[in-house]
Curated annotation (Swiss-Prot):
Phylogenetic placement of the source organism: Eukaryota, Metazoa, Chordata, Craniata, Vertebrata
Lumenal side: 31-440
Name of the gene encoding the protein in the UniProt record: GCNT3
Transmembrane segments: 13-30
Post-translational modification: N-glycosylated.
Name of this chain's protein: Beta-1,3-galactosyl-O-glycosyl-glycoprotein beta-1,6-N-acetylglucosaminyltransferase 3
UniProt entry tagged with the keyword Glycosyltransferase: yes
GO terms assigned for molecular function: acetylgalactosaminyl-O-glycosyl-glycoprotein beta-1,6-N-acetylglucosaminyltransferase activity; beta-1,3-galactosyl-O-glycosyl-glycoprotein beta-1,6-N-acetylglucosaminyltransferase activity; N-acetyllactosaminide beta-1,6-N-acetylglucosaminyltransferase activity
An example Gene Ontology CC term for this record: Golgi membrane
Compartment(s) of residence: Golgi apparatus membrane
Length: 440
């Protein structure tokens, strides 16, 4: 009799335990279904649930980037000087500096792609119908600092876009393998089919972009515009904001294109030869082909698909390309000159009224050291709050408010080893704005 009672208690205990487990699983399933409902509904892009605050909150909670430092990013993005000073002081504390992720880290974590994408918080579905219907192409030229590349890719990534990655042939093998491992996790990210050794200020920097252009035109993705990036770039607009800006171009391109100074004219007066670096020769060059006037700009462009097609297929474009191959830093005058060529789609006339400065174009926001100064006295921007490299500002936290006031799509230069706080706050700002459509 005692045994029977014990068995009944045991069975009752098992029953209650099983019921408790069932209820717990039901709650978990309900929460999971709500989460999946928000995600799945957002995929069809017509869901009112996705527009709801609740679903946005769930989405943001799952996609919010983990803060590495306890700094006031909301204050920094709004230009609060106390928050900026605290971030700059925080950045000076060596003990708080985090070592960047290594090639080995990415080789290991990408063995499980789903875990990698979830842990690193990649957005894996379009956030709006407008974005889905307007895919963007990227040519990404990199050679070092694997974490910089992964964070840049994460910041510009959207599944409807297409990304070509060119890795310098001279890069260490472990870096190349880490890049391959990262891009293997995404169906719309690929390595350029032809890789070249990139030498500073030489033709090879242009060739890297041309190789990606060829590959991107072969893609089945109907991209509308091409943006090119390097490893020290970072977006300052969300993908939705980029789509809006590109639509407003209405087929035009956007890149710096100005009359060259006498100093810059010397870049194509004599031929240059390349070994491990660029060497000036005494051989004078012939004038540019087709009596084309030369213009100068920078390496970055926002180019329509039709412009890219004409770069690769138009005989006049090809003649100019051949002519600039032995000049100094051809990326800084090839695109600028093609932007003024009358046969190029989306170009603008030679006339001085159409000169475009780097501040007017939307391609890239850069602080040049020799232009920094007192804005109240006419300087275009205040001094860099980070450090300078080749007379270009590597941004600090004190630059972020100014950066976000500009209309450019991307900015240069960022380096987490110089100031990771500015990148952390920019990442947080962009992710919040992508989900909620509002600033921090």
């Amino acid at each position: 009799m005692k045994m029977t009672g014990w068995k009944k208690k045991l069975c009752r205990g098992h029953h209650l335990w099983a019921l408790g487990c069932y209820m717990l699983l039901a709650v978990v399933a309900l929460r999971l279904s709500l989460r999946l409902k928000c995600d799945v509904d957002s995929l069809d892009l017509e869901s009112r649930d996705f527009q709801s605050q609740r679903c946005r909150d769930i989405l943001y909670k799952n996609l919010k980037l983990p803060a590495k430092r306890s700094i006031n990013c909301s204050g920094i993005t709004r230009g609060d000087q106390e928050a900026v000073v605290q971030a700059l002081l925080d950045n000076l504390e060596v003990k708080k500096k985090r070592l960047p992720f290594t090639d080995t880290y990415y080789l290991n974590i990408t063995r499980d792609c789903e875990r990698f994408k979830a842990q690193r918080k990649f957005i894996q579905f379009p956030l709006s119908k407008e974005e889905l219907d307007f895919p963007i192409a990227y040519s990404m030229v990199v050679h070092e600092k694997i974490e910089n590349f992964e964070r840049l890719l994460r910041a510009v990534y959207a599944p409807q876009n297409i990304y070509c990655v060119h890795v310098d042939v001279k890069s260490p093998e472990t870096f190349k393998e880490a890049v391959k491992a990262i891009i293997s996790c995404f169906p719309n990210v690929f390595m350029a089919s032809k890789l070249v050794p990139v030498v500073y200020a030489s033709w090879s920097r242009v060739q890297a972009d041309l190789n990606c252009m060829e590959d991107l035109l072969q893609s089945s993705v109907p991209w509308k515009y091409l943006l090119n990036t390097c490893g020290t770039d970072f977006p300052i607009k969300t993908n939705a904001e980029m789509v809006l800006a590109l639509k407003m171009l209405n087929g035009k391109n956007s890149m710096e294109s100005e009359i060259p100074s006498e100093y810059k004219k010397n870049r194509w007066k004599y031929r240059y030869e390349v070994t491990d670096r660029l060497y000036l020769t005494s051989k004078m060059k012939d004038p540019p082909p087709d009596n084309l006037p030369m213009f100068t700009g920078n390496a970055y462009f926002v180019a329509s698909r039709a412009f890219v097609q004409h770069v690769l297929e138009n005989p006049k474009s090809q003649r100019l390309i051949e002519w600039v191959k032995d000049t100094y830093s051809p990326d800084e005058h090839l695109w600028a000159t093609l932007q003024r060529a009358p046969w190029m789609p989306g170009s603008v006339p030679y006339h001085p009224k159409y000169h475009i400065s780097d501040m007017t174009a939307i391609a890239r926001l850069v602080k040049w050291q020799d232009h920094e100064g007192d804005v109240s006295m006419g300087a275009p921007y205040a001094p860099c709050s980070g450090i300078h490299q080749r007379a270009i500002c590597i941004y600090g936290a004190g630059d972020l408010y100014w950066i976000l006031q500009n209309h450019h799509l991307l900015a240069n230069k960022f380096d987490p080893r110089v100031d990771d706080n500015v990148l952390q706050c920019l990442e947080e700002y962009l992710r919040h704005k992508a989900i909620y459509g509002t600033e921090l």
